């Protein structure tokens, strides 16, 4: 189907000129400064402060312009030397950077002789290096031959007959729907559908997944929101029980086991149920979604370098865009940085208009003829001109946008990896957190500054006045980040909590070594029903052995420092860094791509690259969709709870999309920030706002009065207080509810602190409860420490508190993600109690426990000993409910904080259909039983 003609808005995108000549002049001046001889004052790029724009810039007044730095002239035609102290022009001698690159590089006059590393090193270094390279050459030849034998074996043995025909149709599919239909035919023909139906498998904990899914369904049917939150806190984790393992998606062409699909759908449905529940406060929801978001993490799309091979990334981006599965965190290096910049500076609607073959008309970086770039290479040591590349790249970055401005516009976090020109400086990941005011086009140039291709560049940034100045961040000049860290997974995990990485790998020197002997995502082994080895076990083992031995030789070269510096760069880590992620996509390149590795694509080539990139991404969409289903359910909860806390309203539709105030923009400020540290600022602002009004407890005096009347705490309790500034509290002994005491609007009751949780033991106890035959044992996985406490004779108890009960307090105290001094946690602790008759008894270490006599007792309110004692009754209860078919899966009502407060004040709670009063009649187990 031919593409539709571009709209008027799209036509404007193609014709807009984003070039800013003033910014280019400032960039040229920054490049002219000498790195070796530091200048005095604040005009040095090596100093913390940045120098001013050139005098001809209209953005600065003449009074603010600094004196120009001394001029450096070099070469045979530098003019006649003048003597005297008033000499303004200085002459500097030239020396070659290395024998491999005799370029015009300014160096200091006085060079200290380096200390020798020893006679043995100098004598053995070069013979050992040549010997290792000879071994590498032999092993690489053997590796190429092995791979070709594997291809011949699969062509002769594996892909024959009808499945070979289906495979050709799969590779020629033009749309995702065509690919899906052919993939289903292949799964049916090869018998992979039978593998999907069988629940048991050794690659994941199928028994645990089944029990968790059944438990979540029952808790959701019983309207036990807090029990559901407890269970979700355990199972909403990255790769829980192996459900996100690549092996689970490498046995079929499309999809995975039905048990895994059902588990993911149930988890997403439970998250939406918690989001729309009315029997928990908004503060509890906020703490819960923050905790599960921290455990589950976020996804990231990583675009590697690869010169002209990197344009395959556009096809991968298009496939994820059309499937609405683009992650919010995007990173790119070198050529991938250019693709990532286009992705993160345009909205979805704009990208759909730009990802067409006509995009090749805007890629003109390599358009200079041979005579021009060869002369430039002889003079400067680089094939391309930095200023010319800056001018051409401004269209992709939408002018001089900064990282922060791009994040504000699209909601996507752009990350560019760069390396300082110094050999021992660490890699720097530029984004809206580490370099918010840095210009994206300068970061792209720095990331593409491969030695010999482009000289190291200076990063540029906007100041408070909007002027362009050098950005000194860990160095003065930067170069290609793929030399050391092509895929910055460690920095992404630290800054954005990325636990799932999607890597599009196009580096030509790495692409050949990607080989999956047991199949990859959406590409199973064709013979032995997916259980065999590609090319047989012997060839697969030989391929793995040769590849590991090659890596060993490169590590020896790096560790012994045998590799000389070529073009002032260390190339020893080019083959030793990590180039893969949790899900790695390798577009299928051709031999012709090697001959155009530094050439611009035309429209036919761009059309082919877009199609190849889409086809390599289609098999992975099923795995990414399952991951994004849970991730976006968490994001919906966080987003709507934050909106409700600000505007006291939230949507109840589980299918509600993320809010967008401006239809033309993604509206990043309306979304929940990706980085988790921003929530700490949200809590801090809430605390400061309440301190200004003098309120330390409820938001209003009425709320404080209601909360104070629910229970009173005994001053004899010596438990640790959550609020350190509160050194005294209300009595602990419970009194009959009569006339509520008068409470000052500025006084708040003290919330007790739950016992310190030992997550090492509790996490194992949680799984023990999941495997228990009785359902309610799962409902409180974080309450297992109650078994460690025993009754004390000096505990103060009321007559009706002889039985031990666990309080159903705030979810905030069950996780460790919120500050202990947060006043919001106090409100959650107090707001989590239902009104009604409550009795308190102090347990060990002065920790009170509460008995809540509400209309219907939730299963999660019962102690674990009580659950084990009455497990048979609970089982019969649920079996009777299931047989009668009276377990509804409720939707959500419209939730507001006023409705939650009113339901809490009246003592109302949601009753599960079919009745669950029988569980309340079970006699509890006494202490010490």
From Swiss-Prot:
Annotated PROSITE patterns: PNPLA
Superkingdom as given in the UniProt entry: Eukaryota
GO molecular function: triacylglycerol lipase activity
Region listing for Disordered, in residue ranges: 37-85, 644-765, 778-806, 818-929
Catalytic-site annotation from UniProt: 334 (nucleophile), 480 (proton acceptor)
Compositionally biased residues, Low complexity: 43-54, 779-806
Classification via Gene3D superfamilies: Cytosolic phospholipase A2 catalytic domain
TM ranges: 126-146
GO cellular component, one term: membrane
Residues of the PNPLA domain: 301-493
UniProt record similarity statement: Belongs to the PLPL family.
UniProt cross-references to PANTHER family, sorted A to Z: NEUROPATHY TARGET ESTERASE/SWISS CHEESE D.MELANOGASTER, TRIACYLGLYCEROL LIPASE PTL2
Protein name as annotated: Patatin-like phospholipase domain-containing protein CNE02340
